[in-house]
């Protein structure tokens, strides 16, 4: 059904188009992807004729800074936080919409002599800024395109177009398979691209290891840094986790208010304590404490979100009101830490199916979801209900 990453890279180097699919629990779609360095009017025409989606150009932040490409909006409320810049046309184009002129704009975007003033705004080419770290940081088509370009040794920019069926519906995997067969195109998944990069790259470093006695038992604590940002994470390991058997794991995102101050607004503190106690009882397991405060928006923004909740917004609406998606967490670094610990098969302590999908995308097998439900308090009943209704959490309330 799917091709190897190496096969896709060979075709991309020849100027061909490939199809890249993401996870069914994310956008669940496929995009045509080509290298921007080799773009032609013919490739653009193929994409708009058979893809029917929006033609975008994933680039690095360096390109955006050099060409003064500002964000399209000041508050991005897109559910996947896709980083659109202002759209552009090269000044040499007329309307900018033809396949030839769109190709010209893309070619000039890559021209090292180009300046911001060489592009009209708005236009018909939509640059997207890829996250530093690529698909290991964000498992999206934007990052996949830039990663593929880098792996090909080309300029770090791609051209992508969503694939839509003739009836206007989004093409899903069965449709994409037929499309790939019809046009003899290689088809890969972002999950496989992540696995390929993980096999060839390491982004986390063990910095310190100690014995940590706690109220719940004694753990082996390992501190990690990573090359994507300045955040430091810690793994608390219990027992021998090198046997190859599935290991009980809790991936816990930092919550200062709940973990330290015992806030009743959430169930984070009780979940943390219950997870440590359960790992201690089993005599083997890992609690990975990730510095992703407030589902990734940070402490101060979490407090601002709490203020909005006091005004009647729920937890998802509050995030969106502040310009954030409902959940900004990524699992790439956490997955690398778990892999560094030698884990392959997990029994995951979680109520969040998205966390399962997030980790499985990084070559970790979740063989069992172990529920971690805490008794609801009067102050967090509404919060927990929103997690069920809008975030898909598996709770019995």
Swiss-Prot record:
Catalytic activity: D-ribulose 5-phosphate = (2S)-2-hydroxy-3-oxobutyl phosphate + formate + H(+); GTP + 4 H2O = 2,5-diamino-6-hydroxy-4-(5-phosphoribosylamino)-pyrimidine + formate + 2 phosphate + 3 H(+)
Keyword Ribonucleoprotein belongs to the record: no
Binding site for Mg(2+) 2: 27, 141
Residue numbers marked as site, Essential for DHBP synthase activity: 124, 162
Any GO BP: riboflavin biosynthetic process
Binding site for Mg(2+) 1: 27
EC number: 4.1.99.12, 3.5.4.25
Residue stretches in coiled coil: none
Pfam families the record matches: DHBP_synthase (PF00926), GTP_cyclohydro2 (PF00925)
Spans annotated as GTP cyclohydrolase II: 200-397
Names of required cofactors: Mg(2+); Mn(2+); Zn(2+)
Name this protein carries in UniProt: Riboflavin biosynthesis protein RibBA
Organism of origin: Bacillus cereus (strain ATCC 14579 / DSM 31 / CCUG 7414 / JCM 2152 / NBRC 15305 / NCIMB 9373 / NCTC 2599 / NRRL B-3711)
Gene coding for it: ribBA
